[in-house]
Design a protein with these regions (language model features):
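Jelly-roll (double-stranded beta-helix
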Residues: 1-57, 65-156
């Protein structure tokens, strides 16, 4: 009964280089066991990158858009809490280097590993990917929740 089925604990190996941003209501804890990683986030209306070095731990507050980037031969531990049945995760792409949403999908997440792939494939087959412009069905006008992009300290 180490965590009473309340946590997801998993190792992630590199490489992992993507353009999508994950939106989760709960906190995520990152620990780099081998190598370094970059964690681009959207905070205070602009993109910043948190560098997590080998041996470092970083707690990302909930509702912060983030895009973990790992190089080859890196290993990191990630701890997330189990989602409540009422919670929804999001996957979002932005227009170029702007904070304008290009494409997003919201879903209940019980297995991020298997549930991300269909959303990513949908994006790469989309008109939004082809044109780089948001389309009428690419953004939820009434998202389940609004990302909180202001709760990460500025010294990261």
């Amino acid at each position: 009964m180490m965590h009473n089925d309340q946590l997801k604990v998993f190792f992630v190996g590199g490489p992992n280089q993507r353009k999508d941003f994950h939106l989760e209501e709960g906190e995520e804890l990152f620990y780099m066991r081998k190598g370094d990683m970059s964690l681009p986030i959207l905070t205070n209306g602009e993109f910043r990158t948190v560098e997590i070095r080998e041996g470092d731990v970083f707690l990302l507050p909930g509702r912060i858009p983030h895009s973990p980037q790992r190089e080859k031969d890196t290993v990191g531990l990630v701890i997330e809490r189990e989602r409540l049945p009422t919670e929804t995760d999001g996957l979002r792409y932005y227009v170029g280097d702007t904070t304008q949403t290009l494409f997003e999908r919201w879903f209940f997440c019980d297995d991020l590993g298997s549930q991300l792939k269909p959303v990513i494939e949908e994006f790469f087959a989309s008109e939004e990917f082809r044109t780089g412009k948001p389309g009428p069905s690419s953004i939820n006008e009434n998202p389940p929740w609004i990302p909180d992009s202001s709760r990460v300290r500025s010294n990261y």
